[in-house]
């Protein structure tokens, strides 16, 4: 009884944190994209139990996702420029209806760029996990870690900090997994390689996505 009460209290605190974050964030700017996904679902509803990818532009621009994992049923619900709180807020519209077997989240970089601390981003991640598992307790959540870019190199240490906190969280939560992609764009000198980015030096090009797919593939096949 005590363990149940404690678990319920932890969930309540997490959901209260979600509510507080949402009252100070503008979600309206994503309405057009979210509505477009819902309209598409009416004519081509994704299969239940699929692998759902959600997050910011790294997910949205992953056009080769179905080809990279041809033997899996994958659903892309990324919306560029979004933060973790956006995926949490819109979960009831672009996660829950599909009842995915796994949710792959790649987000957090925009959060840091907009001034959030690594601790705040990690807190938002925990809120995301709580929201998803409140509705889908058996769905595995896979965090695709943050990785540095040329354009945002100055936040690389904060990205490392977020990754480290998520890794520690995963150790205590077996229903959550972590994919380390931080080294993916780095060269032998420890700097991001221009050849894996498009002209904006922020987003991956085809070569970058090829490397990303290699990192993610073992978690798709499990």
Residue map of PLM features:
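Extracellular glycan-modifying ectodomains
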Residues: 44, 93, 110, 126-135, ...
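N-terminal secretory targeting modules
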Residues: 1-53, 59, 63, 67-68, ...
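Charged helix-capping and loop-helix junction motifs
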Residues: 118-128, 158-163
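Oxyanion-hole/transition-state-stabilizing segment in secreted/luminal serine hydrolases
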Residues: 59-75, 84-122, 142, 146-150
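Sec-exported extracytoplasmic/periplasmic mature domains
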Residues: 92, 96-99, 108, 130-137, ...
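Catalytic His-Asp segment of secreted/periplasmic serine-dependent ester chemistry enzymes
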Residues: 148-222
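Cell-envelope and extracellular/periplasmic
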Residues: 78-80, 104-117, 126, 133, ...
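Structural recognition of the beta-strand scaffold that forms the well-ordered cores
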Residues: 51-54, 74-78, 102-107, 140-145, ...
């Amino acid at each position: 009884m005590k363990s149940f009460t404690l678990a319920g209290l932890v969930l309540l605190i997490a959901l209260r944190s979600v509510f507080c974050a949402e009252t100070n964030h503008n979600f309206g700017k994503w309405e057009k994209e979210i509505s477009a996904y819902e309209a598409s679902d009416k004519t081509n509803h994704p299969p239940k139990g699929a692998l759902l990818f959600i997050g910011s532009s790294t997910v949205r621009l992953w056009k080769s996702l179905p080809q990279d994992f041809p033997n899996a049923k994958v659903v892309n619900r990324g919306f560029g420029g979004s933060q973790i709180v956006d995926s949490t807020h819109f979960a009831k519209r672009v996660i829950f209806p599909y009842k995915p077997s796994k949710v792959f989240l790649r987000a957090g970089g925009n959060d840091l760029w907009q001034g959030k601390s690594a601790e705040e981003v990690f807190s938002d991640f925990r809120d995301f996990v709580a929201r998803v598992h409140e509705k889908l307790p058996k769905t595995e959540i896979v965090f695709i870690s943050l990785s540095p870019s040329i354009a945002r190199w100055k936040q690389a240490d904060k990205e490392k900090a977020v990754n480290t906190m998520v890794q520690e969280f995963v150790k205590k939560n077996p229903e959550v997994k972590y994919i380390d992609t931080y080294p993916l764009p780095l060269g032998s000198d420890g700097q991001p390689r221009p050849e894996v980015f498009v002209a904006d030096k922020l987003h991956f090009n085809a070569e970058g996505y090829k490397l990303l797919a290699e990192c993610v593939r073992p978690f798709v096949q499990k």
